[in-house]
Amino acid sequence: MKPWLLLVLLCAAAPASARTAFQARCEDTIGQSVSVMSSKQNGYRIDNSYSFHGLSAMKGERAPGSYVLGLTRTESQVRIGIQGRMLSDPATGYECVAPRLEVHMTYLPIVVYVGREFRPGTCAYREILAHELRHRDIYLNALPRAEKVVSDALARRFQGKPLYAPGGQARNLLQREIDTGWMPFIKREMEKVERLQAAIDTPREYARLGKVCAGEVQSLIRPAKSKRTT
């Protein structure tokens, strides 16, 4: 995070007996820095409208000659709102702010795709769906973990103390810290889920899916390979 904020926060964290009059007024009247976390699970739906050719195109990069039989997709979203009281000190030319950060993290509704070549109720459909539901569960479980990591990091950073800056700069510098530090940090934390997703899609798992149900999967995709419809 930004060095100026770190320095003035350390000054603000000095023992109460060493506080300046301005520090005492700030800490005693404008309240504490607060981070309010919220997250929302938006559920999931199953979509059987795409062919495996369409799903392969949707996924994009993949191993040569491979096909995508099912796919699970969502998108992370982060919003950070800033409020808080401020005081100015004409004698020192400094100001203090007790920020209230409201952080909202969510994934858009998860869409679980299964190629339309695989009819619901068949063995192949059940196997492909079971594989994709593992991906769904990773997304559902990732959100509370990411929320805790972010909450702990914010608590360490702000320590419930006001922040100090030269007059007229506190809000802009705080916004800059949010934009260039916290927003990228939170997005990276939410994107870590993709490494867990990749760990499911191993060559061994793909080979297993190709052989399940007495070869039903291969028997369904073989005649469809030449059609290439979405």
Give the residues covered by each predicted segment.
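Active-site alpha-helix of zinc metalloproteases
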Residues: T122-E127, R136
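Family-specific functional microsites
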Residues: K148, A155-R156
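Sec-dependent signal peptide recognition
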Residues: K2-L7
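Catalytic Zn2+-binding segment of zinc metalloproteases
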Residues: L133-V150
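N-terminal signal peptide c-region/cleavage motif recognized by signal peptidases
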Residues: A13-P15
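Cleaved targeting-peptide boundary
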Residues: A18-C26
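Metalloprotease/metallohydrolase-associated module, dominated by Zn2+-dependent proteases
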Residues: V34-M105, I110-R116, R156-T230
